[in-house]
Amino acid sequence: MTRRRLLLGGLGAALSAPALAQVAPRGCRGPVYLTIDTGWSREAERIAAILGRHGVRATLFVADEPTFRGDTSLSDAWAPFWRARAAEGHVFASHTWRHWYFRGDPAPGRVTFAARGGGASEVLDQGALCAELARPVEALRRMAPEARILPLWRAPGGITTPGALRMAEACGLRHQGWTRNGFLGDELDSAAHPNAALLRRNLAAIGPGEVLVMHWGVRGRREPFADIFEDLVTGLVARGLCFETLPERGVPA
């Protein structure tokens, strides 16, 4: 069986599971869709605890990235974390395995995939791209067989090429970015974008239908975004917004 068929078969199994009903609470004037990419994961437990306290379910895009513990985010040591998130009703999607970046389409059915900052790169054909997108899902499924996985993917940095989008569609996956006001800013420099400023901006700008993006922790940010995350959640709820996981076909962004 090819890796492409394996991916499509795995997604079919995921989609055959009952979808979690999402009923908007009274007073909800529209949904927002919180998505979390893996990242450095330093604040992962803190963020997960906040989500749990407020009953927020998110869509988690997984890649095998280096973490603050010296391992990688889809190594066996992280299995308890991912199992707990699946049990809480969060849903999952692929963020590529290596978290490299798409840099161009050198030929039809080919896409250049390069490590951040240069250095290693390779040209992926259709089968290799499907395998790159399938691998994090396969690793997650081994750790958390009950995890609900959506037929979506997110390119690292949100950077795509026309070829990568077409080829991923052939793997059965639709790309999911984030909306203009959904970039929460946890990757920005703390000196230029302190938490207080990010909180004010996000509470003022985010409205119904936004797809939000953040990480389980960002290595280069000295002022952890997790310090204001609970205030952001409660502030958005106070404005009548309700958190939902992404639908299977994604949301325009």
Residues of each region from the PLM?
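N-terminal signal peptide c-region/cleavage motif recognized by signal peptidases
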Residues: A14-P18
